[in-house]
């Protein structure tokens, strides 16, 4: 019996992700020994939900703390719902392309720190035993290019023991 190859597709909510899923669906259509894991990493909580102004009054401090907990929970629930919707759309695109649904899985994680995104993707690939990671790369204006790093470029630079596909 041939071992199944596993591909991890790292998705975000931009148009490039849809192109990535369509591309993978097109080139893997009909493959029997292939499994795909669709990954979306929820960004860290926004700073206003991580920082707490506090109070000198203990009761007020507890109240503010509870309110912050509720806001954090609400933000996380909304982010997870958006992630699930994104993953459902990607799953639909892949099944329409001929990928059997039993060969697909989804994974949602929340990042603690923006700088950990690359490591989070590698960790998910290792945990899910994926040999290939697929990411999209959209073009930036020259000015944004100076100040912004491409996730795809960082993955390629840091990759070891895993294949990286970059779809532009």
Where in this protein do the model-derived segments appear?
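Aromatic/hydrophobic pocket-lining residues that form π-stacking "cages" and hydrophobic walls in ligand
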Residues: 24, 90, 121, 155
